[in-house]
Swiss-Prot record:
PTM annotation (Cysteine persulfide): residues: C401
Keywords carried by this UniProt record: 4Fe-4S, Cytoplasm, Iron, Iron-sulfur, Metal-binding, Oxidoreductase
4Fe-4S in keyword set: yes
Keyword Transit peptide tagged: no
Note on cofactor: Binds 1 [4Fe-4S] cluster. Binds 1 hybrid [4Fe-2O-2S] cluster.
Gene Ontology cellular-component terms listed: cytoplasm
Native source organism of the sequence: Rippkaea orientalis (strain PCC 8801 / RF-1)
Taxonomic lineage: Bacteria, Bacillati, Cyanobacteriota, Cyanophyceae, Oscillatoriophycideae
Listed name of the protein: Hydroxylamine reductase
Amino acid sequence: MFCEQCEQTASGNGCHQWGACGKSPEVNAVQDLLVYCLRGLAPVVLKAKELGISTHQADVFTGEALFATMTNVNFDKKRFTKYIRDCITIREQLKAAINQPVAWTDICCYQPNFNESLVEQGQNVALTLISQATNNLDIFSLKLTVLYGIKGCASYNFHAQELGQEDEKVYSFIQEALASLDRNDLSLNDWVNLALKVGETNLKAMELLDAGHTSTYGHPTPTSVPLNPRLGKALLVSGHDIKQLAAILQQTANTGLTIYTHGELLPAHGYPILKQKYPHLYGHYGTAWQNQTKDFAKFPGAIIVTTNCLMPPHETYDEKLFTIGPVGYQGINYLASDETGTPDFTPAIEKALSMPGFTTEETPRNVMVGFAHDAVLKVADTVIEAVQQGKIRHFFLVGGCDGAKPGRTYYTEFVEKVPKDCIVLTLACGKFRFFDKQLGSIGTLPRLMDVGQCNDAYSAIKIALGLANAFNIEVNQLPLSMILSWYEQKAIAVLLTLLYLGIKDIRLGPTLPAFITPNLFKLLSETYNLQSITTPEKDLAACLA
């Protein structure tokens, strides 16, 4: 196997025996085969679009299928086999609809054999892709960057589409990018531009998702969220999917269950319509994804995982674990969606009601969420005045993905060392390194503001652009430093968005992507001053200099 799409890839060079995420070589092979088939579907979709034939089914399918291949989403070989079958079926249906002679390339005509050799077929197409690296390693690096960025973009677009927010330009570019992966006539500069186009498209996908969330559930408002459980039966919802969380809340109304969020669903508590409509959405349980084996084992109720990050489940809790959407693990309960895209959560609800729930109370603890762009920009005048009066010296955006590497303690130490006249904005699961720190406030402004989920990088961008406009300066002139952590492909998409916007001086860690060559990193460093983190002390001093 060959996989280097996540930050924890083995020895920083790539997983070759078994995935650091827990993915087997067999699952990796069928994932590679699915991506290969999607690359063959893409030119057919683009031709159909050119002729005015509807490609909506293919576009939505492509998004979910790419999402399923992301790190810590789906480990179920049978589910990937079905995705591959569906991909070929959709491709051939579109060819029939095109109904004219087309000189399709070999990849558009590929027919997998659905037998015991499926894994070997996946391994073969992976080797074919890897062999391209010998031609130009830097271009191969950019191809992988585009692929991984498109996976992240597709995941955000998947959630936006669930909420009724769609843009044909996003769908079209995802297909164009996939089709480009089979081209060998593009220059290094062409691939750089394509990677930046991924960033541009991802910005639009995040904008669509923000519109879907805020038009459906209201703009987030600063909200206190309990970290201590309350007495009673309980159900835990993990992942990112706020639409599915809302469906769970609707189906559990008047059951007596208390609903807790886990991981990246913490920001859901900031959406006013959810809180007003569903009072049994109570608190948050656990911390970041890599601690789930401990958190899930202790939780005295059923658990539903809506998106990444899923780790290989332990036998102590596998019977109370349920997955939906693109998420899966062989042998774990899967709740399929109906034609409206919503699962019947009855099995999970019944499991939760059969379990003891919380029987003892704990000391109350709370954290604040809800500092998205609408809430922050409403107090822009207060922020500007505080900066002008010297009360606020600097802003730090410290966020991104969390992970299990010891080096990630850097982010905790960094936030702890930030001077008291500075404000920390945070987002995504990287916040769990410090989300419960009591940093105090500057006047009426809390020094630690949770902007939201990883897709709420869009909110952080809007805040930065809004403040730059208010100060009548460029974003790169703001007293703002970005200290980012990455783990999976959504983070790659967000990084490409920031580079597309021309944002400079980003510090990235805990390690650099294995798929980025030294030459490519040098190019990014020279163009954007992208740099790796060093120590909290050195980086703080440099940012404040």
